[in-house]
Regions:
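Residues forming the flavin
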Residues: 1-326
Length: 326
């Protein structure tokens, strides 16, 4: 069994399969295991690696799966010495790996989407999840006066952690109502959009407007703008097999279509956002693999796509008079 991705779903799938005595390889393109768990301040990737290896799982970090071919063959690139300042000359810089698996579990995750609005590409603009990784993985607070603009629930934990780290945080949410508890120090503006960033080499302020009134603007002084326009499952590896992604209207993203080969997609790559549901999907995915291989026969049922408390709102761009959308 080959597992691609070491986030919550991939790890759960690998452990479940290893517990059933399957020969498991887990590959991860990052130098550390954990996927989006690396953005959790209490997470220990070295402990996770020890747990996986103690279960007999072969772990290959710094290894990117770049293609899925006929008969569940996967092409992967392992970066052997790129990260070493003075590498052993007997070692290659990189290795090309051909992995022939009987079943593939894709736990490749999802990418946070940006939102198009005026002057949104100057230094100081990044996705909300990137700022959370900087804070908890690298110990870097990316701004002192931060505005987060969103249409979904995923930014709220980030906002709380940035506030606890000492930043002043303001949230602009395009939705009308949400049911999330926030510290009173965090300002929340509902039905509010980012209109234009002011500044050239750095952010000086952000002009904002209401969803139903873009002619009247307010200005918020800030030094950083974080953006989350939703999440897109990473489905390109199943697309290599000619499997067309399917639009999911409730979650505003493409999810993998029906797969008839020995490939199972789990976690946020399947459009599942809640961490506990991702773990469950990994366990279910491993059981599906064992069913397919004739090792075991269990009733399986994947968690539903989605998982946020409040529905996402469609927001891809904010039109302005300066740059009207065609």
């Amino acid at each position: 069994l080959l597992v691609v991705g070491s986030g919550p779903a991939g790890v759960a799938a690998a452990k479940e399969a290893a517990n059933q005595n399957l020969n498991v390889i887990l590959i991860e393109q990052d130098s550390l295991l954990g996927g989006n768990n690396l953005a959790d301040k209490e997470f220990d990737p070295s402990l996770l690696q020890k747990q996986l290896e103690s279960n007999g799982i072969r772990v290959m970090s710094r290894t990117t799966a770049f293609g899925v071919y006929d008969n569940t063959v996967v092409g992967a690139l392992e970066r052997v010495t790129d990260h070493i300042s003075n590498p052993n000359t007997s070692l290659p810089r990189q290795r090309f790996r051909t992995i022939r698996a009987k079943h593939i579990i894709l736990a490749s995750g999802a990418l946070e989407r940006h939102i198009a609005f005026n002057n949104n590409d100057i230094p100081g603009v990044m996705t909300a999840n990137a700022a959370r990784h900087y804070l908890n993985r690298y110990g870097v607070l990316t701004g002192k006066n931060i505005v987060i603009t969103t249409n979904n629930d995923s930014v709220y934990q980030t906002a709380i952690e940035l506030h606890e780290a000492g930043s002043k945080v303001t949230i602009l949410d395009s939705r009308k109502d949400i049911n999330i508890n926030l510290p009173k120090e965090i300002e929340l503006h509902l039905e509010t959009l980012p209109l234009s960033i002011n500044g050239s080499k750095k952010i000086e302020s952000l002009d904002v407007c209401k969803v139903n009134d873009k002619t009247h603007k307010n200005t918020i002084i800030c030094d950083q703008v974080l953006v989350s326009g939703g999440w897109s499952p990473i489905v390109h590896l199943v697309s290599h097999r000619g499997i067309k992604p399917v639009w999911n209207e409730d979650n505003l993203c493409f999810v993998p279509g029906d797969i008839k080969e020995n490939i199972t997609v789990v976690g946020s790559a399947r459009g599942i956002w809640n961490t506990d549901d991702c773990v469950e999907s990994g366990i279910v995915g491993a059981n599906e693999a064992m069913n397919t291989l004739g090792i075991d026969k269990k009733e399986i049922s994947f968690p539903s796509v989605g998982g946020w408390s409040n529905p996402i709102n469609a927001l891809y761009e904010v039109k302005s008079n300066k740059f009207p959308s065609k």
